[in-house]
From Swiss-Prot:
InterPro entries: Ribosomal_bS16, Ribosomal_bS16_CS, Ribosomal_bS16_dom_sf
Keyword Isomerase in annotation: no
GO cellular component: cytoplasm; small ribosomal subunit
GO molecular function per UniProt: structural constituent of ribosome
Keyword field contains Ribonucleoprotein: yes
Biological process terms in GO annotation: translation
Protein name, entry field: Small ribosomal subunit protein bS16
Entry keyword set: Ribonucleoprotein, Ribosomal protein
Native source species: Nitrosococcus oceani (strain ATCC 19707 / BCRC 17464 / JCM 30415 / NCIMB 11848 / C-107)
Family of the protein in this entry: Belongs to the bacterial ribosomal protein bS16 family.
Gene that encodes the chain: rpsP
C-alpha cells in the first residue's frame, strides 16, 4: 500500500518535513517513491511554510495512495 506522509528532516529542535509518497512498510525517514513538497512548521519572516505539487498529489490520490491525517489537513489548508 502506498501512503503520502511527512518525512522529518532539519536539525535538533528545528524540524523541517518533506511531503513524500512512500510504501507503508518503509521507515518514516527512509526510502520514498517521490517527494511532493515540504512543510516548515516554524517558518519565520519571508520563508514559505508550505509548498505542495498538487498536480502530482492528485495523481497519487487517484492511484489509491492514502494520505496521513496531518498530510490531509495540509492538503486542505493549501487548497483553501
Amino acid at each position: 500500500m502506498v501512503i503520502i506522509r511527512l518525512a522529518r528532516g532539519g536539525a535538533k529542535k528545528r524540524p523541517f518535513y518533506s511531503i513524500v509518497v512512500a510504501d507503508k512498510r518503509s521507515k518514516r525517514d527512509g526510502r520514498y517513491i517521490e517527494q511532493l513538497g515540504f512543510f516548515n512548521p516554524i517558518a519565520a519572516g519571508g520563508e514559505v511554510p508550505l509548498r505542495i505539487d498538487m498536480e502530482r498529489a492528485n495523481y497519487w490520490l487517484s492511484q489509491g495512495a492514502q494520505p496521513s491525517e496531518r498530510v490531509a489537513q495540509l492538503f486542505k489548508s493549501y487548497s483553501a
